[in-house]
């Protein structure tokens, strides 16, 4: 974590959280749509 001097930690956490929620949402949506097995 030496290269995070110019990037705020809260920004990294926010982007990471949004990405995780998006991936999780797509996975759940895919499971309900029946295409979750293709992932």
Swiss-Prot record:
One GO term of the biological process aspect: photosynthesis
Q: What does this protein do?
A: One of the components of the core complex of photosystem II (PSII). PSII is a light-driven water:plastoquinone oxidoreductase that uses light energy to abstract electrons from H(2)O, generating O(2) and a proton gradient subsequently used for ATP formation. It consists of a core antenna complex that captures photons, and an electron transfer chain that converts photonic excitation into a charge separation.
Question: At the top level of its lineage, which domain of life is listed?
Answer: Eukaryota
Its quaternary organisation is:
PSII is composed of 1 copy each of membrane proteins PsbA, PsbB, PsbC, PsbD, PsbE, PsbF, PsbH, PsbI, PsbJ, PsbK, PsbL, PsbM, PsbT, PsbX, PsbY, PsbZ, Psb30/Ycf12, at least 3 peripheral proteins of the oxygen-evolving complex and a large number of cofactors. It forms dimeric complexes.
Q: What is this protein called?
A: Photosystem II reaction center protein J
- Matches recorded under Gene3D superfamilies: 6.10.250.2070
Species for this entry: Pyropia yezoensis
Similarity section: Belongs to the PsbJ family.
Indicate the principal place this protein occupies in or around the cell: plastid
Subcellular locations according to the entry: Plastid, Chloroplast thylakoid membrane
Q: How does it sit in the membrane?
A: Single-pass membrane protein
Report the SUPFAM superfamilies cross-referenced here: Photosystem II reaction center protein J, PsbJ
Q: Does the keyword Metal-binding apply?
A: no
Which UniProt keyword terms apply here?
Answer: Chloroplast, Membrane, Photosynthesis, Photosystem II, Plastid, Reaction center, Thylakoid, Transmembrane, Transmembrane helix
Q: Which InterPro entries match?
A: PSII_PsbJ, PSII_PsbJ_sf
One GO cellular component, as annotated: photosystem II reaction center
Q: Where are the transmembrane segments?
A: 9-29
């Amino acid at each position: 974590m030496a290269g995070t001097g110019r990037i705020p930690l809260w920004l990294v956490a926010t982007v990471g959280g949004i990405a995780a929620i998006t991936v999780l949402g797509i996975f759940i949506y895919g499971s309900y749509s029946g295409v979750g097995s293709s992932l």
